[in-house]
Amino acid sequence: MSPAVEFAYLRPINYQRCQNFKLWSLVVSIEKRIIARELWLAAARPGDIVKPIWFLLLVISMVPLALTPDSELLAEIGSAMIWIATLLALLLNSEHFFQSDFSDGVLEQWLFFDRPLAWLVGLKLTAHWLLHVLPLILISPVIALTLSVPGDVSIALFITMLVATPALTCFSGLGAALTLGSSRSGILGVLVMMPLFVPVVVLASGVLIRAMDGSETLPLLALLGAFSVASAVLVPIAVSLAIRVNIGGSN
């Protein structure tokens, strides 16, 4: 990778102040620079992190008003409502998954790196999960307790979200990559992602139903984990192919 390409990639991260760029290029790996750029974008646009959290809280706060304040009913449907709200919150940010990288030309520069494009996409998906999805997972047990959801079901909810959301994040990235550069990327992305979301949601709801009944949840959790692992391995390859096609079509 030439110094010109490296400098062009670092410019959106605002590293021009680095006094010794050659030393920086030698010391800092490509992976660290990609993570640093994601952190910089998150700091520059904190609303992208806060917006899904506020959306989740808003939807959950409307449930007792729209249905009933009965604690027994809320305890039965609370975990399912949190899952639905989390799913909608993930869709909220999926439209802009690769948009800033595509507009800045960063995706084109990825093609010149001495790393597989699928590996770089995997780093991007991991950073997105840590910054945008993990906060939703961490607050989900607290929200479940406010809806009178039993403690064991709240724990099952937390585990299912922790295991299942990597697959949902991968599918969100795939939908965003397939519709990259489209004027109606939001609608098209949802149409692409929803069929992929269905198996994950079905397995997660099965875990929650078994948790409420006091049945064994480990087999479904193992299947859900295998689904996420397979998605983490295969989806970045599909996303990298979609990015190559979209970049080739835009030139």
What are these regions (language model features)?
Residues 158-177, 229-230, 234:
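Hydrophobic alpha-helical transmembrane segments of polytopic membrane proteins
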Residues 46-68, 83-87, 192-203, 229-235:
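Hydrophobic alpha-helical transmembrane segments of multi-pass membrane transport/permease proteins
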Residues 65, 175-215, 219-223, 227-233:
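Transmembrane helix segments
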Residues 122-148, 167, 171, 204-205:
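Hydrophobic alpha-helical transmembrane segments that constitute the membrane-spanning cores
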Residues 24-52:
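Aromatic- and glycine-rich beta-strand/loop motifs that create alpha-glucan
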Residues 232-251:
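Junction motif at the cytosolic side of a transmembrane helix
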Residues 78-98:
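Long, hydrophobic alpha-helical segments
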Residues 91-111:
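Transmembrane helix boundary and interhelical loop/hinge segments in multi-pass membrane proteins
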